[in-house]
Amino acid sequence: RIAANVSIVQDALKRTIAIENPSHYLTLEGHEFGEIAFLSELVRRSGCTLLVDVNNVYVSARNLGFDAEAIVDAFPADAIAEIHLAGHSADPVLGDALLVDTHDAPIAPAVWALYQRLVARIGPRPTLIERDGNLPAFEELRSERDTAHAVMHACLMAGAGRITEAA
């Protein structure tokens, strides 16, 4: 049903849309598919692309206790159209036991490492840095942009994304 709705939207817009992986704060029981299997099937059925939010992967992994690298490695490379990076914060009550995708902090080193891992596998993709609150000086924003550019450039020079995934 979701794939049909995505197709309806794409047909109405006469363009492909990208679906973003969400951040998770609790385990949802009874699902037929894991997130990557679900998103891969959505891509297959609807022809949509994926917007991979690396901070959402990290936040979800920390909150639910799974391996963020395994998730980053499992996204179908050919379907990824865009990447998002952002900062997160600890929950004001639960602290580091619950991370929240707040877009109000610098990008964490662990998120940068996941971004580098993803880009090394799939090659450079358009990347957006989200910063919605606690805006720093422009120089800090530019520094994050420069870091993302440097990661993409280094991966491109190393031949990232040239290995195709098995069908």
PLM feature spans:
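Conserved, mostly hydrophobic/aromatic
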Residues: 17, 53, 83, 127
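C-terminal helical cap(s) of enzyme catalytic domains, especially alpha/beta-barrels
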Residues: 138-164
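Active-site acidic/histidine proton-transfer and metal-coordination neighborhood
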Residues: 1-49
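Surface-exposed cleft-lining segments at the edges of enzyme active sites
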Residues: 21-31, 56-59, 97-104
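Distinct, well-ordered alpha-helical segments
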Residues: 28-44, 60-73, 139-142
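Gly/Pro-rich active-site loop or hairpin
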Residues: 61-122
